[in-house]
């Protein structure tokens, strides 16, 4: 079962605190609404454009890249622009959510240097090419992002197991998507 942004909620507490007899229900978040698509495309455009602007000015940023869409080719982070095959862009620098991600804030500092200093931005930007602190930020973010993904996976697994136990489901028909990942046919 794929639980992409699955929602787990407890029914039966009628707005009060947990009583211990709540029932778990699981549903998937519906995606693909026109507004979701507009926002996603606007973010891709902004992050790609700003990443290109950093590169044009010789200012390092924190980029996400993916060399190919072949199975097993992962997204990587680095300080130099590189294509992101999954998004179909020449470069992609997270920059649009500085309140959610420190990486975006760092990139915005670099973008502000470009806006204020133009051709001399590389001299004025907070982080210079091959800056050890910038590499440290990338490394720290990679570790935190990986830990977050593992934690999210654990939460989804926990609530799925709770649901299966409450429903007394002991067998499922499923399709193997790839090594160790299956999707339930009728859950």
Task: Specify the residue positions occupied by each region the protein language model found.
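Electropositive polyanion-binding surfaces
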Residues: 1-187
